[in-house]
Amino acid sequence: MRSIKTVHVISAHAEGEVGDVIVGGVKPPPGETIWEQSRFIARDETLRNFVLNEPRGGVFRHVNLLVPPKHPDADAAFIIMEPEDTPPMSGSNSICVSTVLLDGGIVPMQEPETHMLLEAPGGLVKVRAECRNGKAERIFVQNLPSFAAKLDAELEVEGLGKLKVDTAYGGDSFVIVDAEAMGFSLKPEEAHEIARLGVRITNAANKALGFDHPENPDWRHFSFCLFAGKVERTAEGLRAGAAVAIQPGKVDRSPTGTALSARMAVLHARGEMKEGETLTAVSLIGSTFTGRILGTTTVGDRPAILPEISGRGWITGIHQHMLDPSDPWPEGYRLTDTWGAR
């Protein structure tokens, strides 16, 4: 067995969404900040292609690179690589990273709770993990400040006509549509159509509405479309279905932590969710994330919330991705039969 490159990975998922973690074999990319390092990875694409493309990856996989933190108080830092984006933050990936750090013994576990400060490309996030018998059983992440951008905006989508949408930021950027109004009951068998239409809606929103982050001029696009289910009030708090279409055309298996944060920001802006209340989002496979509004703040001149999200993660395996020098596809390949719903 020979290899000119060996990347060491601990595989994990958070409530169904794959979020592998690179723990060795890759040196930190250049950059004075974690954000600058993530921009290098996005531009260079060598590592992204190696781990995300076939034959090592696929459209179903996200991969996180552990790097030394830049902030002196941070316990660890990570860069998120999604199928088409290298985003500021990800809820499911932060849960996967936290699970790997603790269950993998990289950060010492304290029972019944372990507290960590992680540095994501978009900023610092506080993590609290409920731990028992050597397992991080539930991860709580204080996400980046989240805000509603546009409410009840009109969006023309070819073949769908005029839609009423909200746009928001929850650590990543979303266009949000009413699932019921689009004819969806958020069942597993609707996944392909949700993915297909979601990408069309996202692309239309990028052309017609645009997105800008008041404090991050590099982030100027919508990444995802959230199909938002009806909010119900229960004894345990608010509850709603959620399905997020991810570029180039797949549905998140988890409820998507950044989407949950974005939706809470929209509900708060409408006066439909208060500080201290919780919203449980339910994915197409029935998994859940629970969000809570911890407080309020501003992002630039925009009112924002301080969201907390929580969910569970599990390690699924350990892998060594290798590259034989005779392999004619050192960065892999992708084909449209799987790379994008059509």
UniProtKB/Swiss-Prot annotation:
Induction of expression: Is up-regulated when the bacterium is grown on t4LHyp or t3LHyp as sole carbon source.
Protein name as catalogued: Trans-3-hydroxy-L-proline dehydratase
GO molecular function: 4-hydroxyproline epimerase activity; trans-L-3-hydroxyproline dehydratase activity
Source taxon at top rank: Bacteria
Reactions listed under catalytic activity: trans-3-hydroxy-L-proline = 1-pyrroline-2-carboxylate + H2O; trans-4-hydroxy-L-proline = cis-4-hydroxy-D-proline
Function: Catalyzes the dehydration of trans-3-hydroxy-L-proline (t3LHyp) to Delta(1)-pyrroline-2-carboxylate (Pyr2C). Can also catalyze the epimerization of trans-4-hydroxy-L-proline (t4LHyp) to cis-4-hydroxy-D-proline (c4DHyp), albeit with 30-fold lower efficiency. Is likely involved in both degradation pathways that convert t3LHyp to L-proline and t4LHyp to alpha-ketoglutarate, which would allow A.tumefaciens to grow on t3LHyp or t4LHyp as a sole carbon source. Displays no proline racemase activity.
Binding site for substrate: G91, S92, D252, G257, T258
InterPro entries: Pro_racemase_fam
Protein EC: 4.2.1.77, 5.1.1.8
Pfam families, per database record: Pro_racemase (PF05544)
Family: Belongs to the proline racemase family.
Organism lineage string: Bacteria, Pseudomonadati, Pseudomonadota, Alphaproteobacteria, Hyphomicrobiales
